[in-house]
Amino acid sequence: MKLPIYLDYAATCPVDERVVKKMMEFLSIDGNFGNPASRSHKFGWQAEEAVDVARNHIADLIGADSREIVFTSGATEADNLALKGVMRFYQTKGKHLITCKTEHKAILDTCRQLEREGFEVTYLDPKSDGLIDLEELKSVIRDDTVLVSIMHANNEIGVVQDIAKIGEICRERKVLFHTDATQSVGKLPINLSELKVDLLSMSSHKLYGPKGIGALYVCRKPRVRLEAIIHGGGHERGMRSGTLPVHQIVGMGEAYRIAKEEMATEMPRLTALRDRLYNGLKDIEETYVNGSMEQRLGNNLNISFNYVEGESLMMALRDIAVSSGSACTSASLEPSYVLRALGLNDELAHSSIRFTVGRYTTEEEIDYSIGLVKSAVKKLRDLSPLWDMFKEGIDLNSIEWTHH
């Protein structure tokens, strides 16, 4: 077993060796290095064919048509293109957008930008289990609502929203529906030929592909229109200009092909590892799982260890790579906005750790991690006067703390 143990697969994944091998064929003079937009010679044709094959692999995984896949630099750009592209294109129809407070920053910050441009955004509060209230969603849709954007699976707590029902509601009310499926693609079955989803964002590096490449699914029937946010040679049917990075696209395609092949066996294995971890940690006193355990990604466990500071716990767990909050915001010491939105107090939100298992995680690593977490939590609580007071039965909420 190699230390440190990587349990932060929701932040990124190593690139699968099979993907690396495939990508290497599209880089050097000995390989297929052409520009897919070069229509006048073999180098361009071969590159274009490789892009087509990859586009088909990606479409196959999510039950889409390959013509509905638009390559971007990642899921963040796909989210930006979906929200800004749609809201700007349809602004004569209306200027109202609905999302949820627990969305990824790529959605929330884009919404803030749209608000600065004069659009109006409604932010739904999730229930305490992380799921949105579908009746509340119905009640906030207005005549001038253009788009609803609700993520499929949450990056911090792994909670899975019912995108089939949300899609039905949106289609019935003639509102477009975008979902950020960065965390769920390749882990949950997604069939866009059946789901009423108009736009879907995805990433490559959360599925053992390279970083720097992602895609936006844009539905053709009924046709969704959007305004480009990057202009230039009119690539990707005018929706996203820029020379296609063939090696990255091929890498993403191969990663998605492998995921489709292995999903049926890999997901039960990951769920078993996650449950093994949970069963090893749940007996620690004052630990709480954040988010629904039923509607959840099989590889995600987000736990708060009361009376332990999350940052100190992460430092004490030097041999395990985990995170508190999402990688995109873990640089700040603010408690997770996702957990605060679920109604957790600052203390519990601050004491949360996200464990996410993946393709290279073993049972041995899980068992080692359980032992490490148990001893670290015990050690930190032994140092904590708050833990002593709690054990003495003092209600910490009733104490008036004063500044001296």
From Swiss-Prot:
Entry GO MF terms: 2 iron, 2 sulfur cluster binding; cysteine desulfurase activity; metal ion binding; pyridoxal phosphate binding
Coiled coil ranges: none
Binding-site residues for pyridoxal 5'-phosphate, renumbered to this chain: 75-76, 155, 183, 203-205, 243
Record-listed [2Fe-2S] cluster binding positions: 328
Gene3D superfamilies according to UniProt: Aspartate Aminotransferase, domain 1 (3.90.1150.10), Type I PLP-dependent aspartate aminotransferase-like (Major domain) (3.40.640.10)
Keywords: 2Fe-2S, Cytoplasm, Iron, Iron-sulfur, Metal-binding, Pyridoxal phosphate, Transferase
Gene Ontology terms describing biological process: [2Fe-2S] cluster assembly
Pathway: Cofactor biosynthesis; iron-sulfur cluster biosynthesis
Modified residues (N6-(pyridoxal phosphate)lysine): 206
Catalytic residues (positions): 328 (cysteine persulfide intermediate)
Pfam families: Aminotran_5 (PF00266)
Entry GO CC: L-cysteine desulfurase complex
Subcellular localization: Cytoplasm
Classification via HAMAP family: Cys_desulf_IscS
Family statement drawn from the similarity comment of this UniProt entry: Belongs to the class-V pyridoxal-phosphate-dependent aminotransferase family. NifS/IscS subfamily.
Function: Master enzyme that delivers sulfur to a number of partners involved in Fe-S cluster assembly, tRNA modification or cofactor biosynthesis. Catalyzes the removal of elemental sulfur atoms from cysteine to produce alanine. Functions as a sulfur delivery protein for Fe-S cluster synthesis onto IscU, an Fe-S scaffold assembly protein, as well as other S acceptor proteins.
Protein known as: Cysteine desulfurase IscS
